């Protein structure tokens, strides 16, 4: 039985939304990867996924690496999405042979995450104007990202009832809907409390209509702050502080690296970051070792 690519992809995406409960961002990434796969199938004249061979799939990976100009990590993610599609088709009884079983993903060269110095982190935070509504908000966001190790998506979706400033902790909803309660630093707690008292009520008052947002961080119109806007806040603070190449994830990297430099156990840091594998967290230990080598060489 023929398995048309378009119908198969549609069915698979509906499956991951309904059955797996994946986040909107994750599903959107799957869709982009599989759109790329469908475009290649159109180019080579293949529509029946049941007839796709491992050799043809290897051609797709080569095309993605060479002609589509994707990085090794993007190719790996795309292959993972295609592999998920074929596993779904096999589970549904639509194919008898999975062409992805004998296909390996390209290896990714180890790229160490960038960590800011404490001095640069402070400079970014202090670049926010403490006398304006947005400056107070921006400082709270920066302090929270660095003081909790939260992902940017976790920060902008955080609700007021998830915060416990008395115990200085927050309940974060991470990838796959997994929840974890993590402590937040005293500076972050104070900055968020100042924002909740001095800035958020005034921003909320600017809301014209619609639902009252439960999210902690708001935009100038009183609505929930978007990921893109939060990214812009971090980038603007870095520019004001003269710190190049900074993203929200850089603050998360810095949180982890500084904890490990202070002697924290790698598995504790793994729990705080909400990472499923300690191997991912151990990358940060390489950063701290490299830094120790630099200090030793300079002494």
Model regions and ranges:
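Conserved catalytic core of the tyrosine transesterase superfamily
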Residues: 1-299
